[in-house]
Amino acid sequence: MRAFGLAMVLLAAAGTWSCTERADAQAPAAVAAKAEGAPYALAGTQVWTVPDPVSGREYEVFVSLPASYETSPERRYPVVYVTDADYAFPIIRQIARRVNLEGPVIEEFILVGLSYSRGDSGVASRNRDYTPTPNGPSSAKASLHGQGPAYQTYLKNQAIPFIESRFRADPARRVLLGHSYGGLLGAQVLFSDPTLFHSYVLGSPSFWFDKGHTMRVEADYARSHRDLPADVFMYIGAYEVPGPSPRNTDDADMVGDVRAMEQKLKSRGYPGLQVRSTVLEDEDHLTVAPVGFTRALMAVLPAKRG
């Protein structure tokens, strides 16, 4: 299975529980006077260090506030928590602004990017923190996977309280958005603590992990629960099936897995569940995310009309 690659690097902030405001790019004259170009920074974003006291790891969270945040001091906003923040945070931030240029399409929200643990590579951090069991791909050591439950506890006890104590967040309207292993993490939270978030975006979710572990967890949940109070949106690229193209997946039928999960969830008759999915044509595991992000935000946070 091809890994979900990183595409962008953000500036890091030093210090525990510290904040750095992003600055606008330097003026051309100042840049020209330097031997090297200045790093590109996203204006109006913040980086906070939120450590995990249990594991001792340090994580950064990236924050982008909506345009009306300062002018609407009484308003509380939904919060979108996105995994793989180094890649996804700048993309989602721009989508939210671009789509609304000619009128409201997506409701304004606070965007929170969940970055990787400091000192670890993105691959190592996500393999460890986003997976539910140690039983990863056969080529991987067991120690590299399986700490998703511990990371979920970190989100619940550290990251979310940090955000909600500092920003005007609506705790009843949290959204968790993840792609690939991030979608796998979302499914883990959905079936173990569904009310932690109101909406779940499971993008190209790795339901193949550990021989279909998530499918078994879904069945276990159904045996002991009569409701699943959540709004679930899944997206998948049409190429995410085995096939002759280099864009196809190596062996997992991820499209079939998403369809099977949607069918299973709908068959349960949970009164509090809304679930839907979309297969995006001419997209593969590495290209589908920007389109999937857009469709997902339009689905789970549609702008209020009138």
Predicted regions and their residues:
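Bacterial N-terminal signal peptides that target proteins for export
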Residues: 1-8
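C-terminal motif of bacterial Sec signal peptides marking the signal peptidase cleavage site
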Residues: 17-18
